[in-house]
Amino acid sequence: MGSGTGEEPATNKRLPVRGVAGVSCLLMTHFKKIQLVSFVSIFAFAGFASGQQNAGMKPEETEIWTPVPAVVTPGATDAAPPSDAIVLFDGKSLDQWVNAQTGAPAEWIVGDGILTVKKGPGIGNIQTKRTFKNYQLHVEWRIPENITGSGQARGNSGVFLASTGPNDDGYELQVLDSYNNLTYVNGQAGAIYKENPPLVNPNRKPGEWQTYNIVWTAPTFNEDGSLKSPAYVTAFMNGMLVQNHFQLIGQTLFIGKPYYKKYDRAPIKLQAHGDKSEPISFRNIWVRELP
């Protein structure tokens, strides 16, 4: 029965729509606060548990004594090879290199402590006699002061970190005159060719020596040829980081998308590019094998 006033009892009144929304908002806010407090509590407990785990430990329990790192004598300068390095070019001979296509002795030009690309039919790329897996590589290169051409036809070459075939097969760190020379960014000096541009452009003027210091982690493969772990490269150019542990997506290709092809160990290759510009030079090439 009614109250005689014609109004519903206060206890039976419905909340206005705004009131319902407000209550919902209030409940959600409280719920989020509870969640936040819960997460904070969990992390605090984890930190407390870790602290408890370390309670009573002695400093000696986290000391590692073996195996003892090998003693390596550094070079007299940062550019000089350390005592455990394999010198690939000592400024005197090409004893460590062969023609990448034929396996015959390399025919590039050696003089005044410098190795210069020799262009011409049947000469082509050169690669190391030795094969490598993971390593640290030092190489210096120079674009001629009188360089001509533009874009990719201006001092083009490359350091192939793993040569997987006789021509331009493999994984290339680009060499090019990129001092005021416009080209696609994943094709300029310091780029993993057609895969990743350099982080910065630290190129010096033509006629000045440039330096690459490279750490190469080779890809590994399963028995069926499928990829087990990808290749990684870290590279410094003239002391500046240009590739930061970049994960390659396959071999570097001029045309098409990169892909992996199974190999175990591979030579390091230097490219004799077919452009008509003046040939570039290299010096002071050494490598340290890594685990």
Kindly give the residue locations of the regions a language model identified.
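N-terminal amphipathic/basic-hydrophobic helices that include classical n-h-c signal peptides
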Residues: M1-L27, A231
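Residue-level detector of alpha-helix boundary/anchor positions
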Residues: S3-G4, S41, P81
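Serine/threonine-rich, low-complexity intrinsically disordered segments
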Residues: E7, N12-K13, F31, L36, ...
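Intrinsic low-complexity/disordered segments
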Residues: K13, L27, K32, A49-S50, ...
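Bacterial N-terminal signal peptides that target proteins for export
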Residues: V23-F39
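Bacterial N-terminal signal peptides
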Residues: V37-G47
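Carbohydrate-interacting regions of secretory-pathway proteins
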Residues: A49-P291
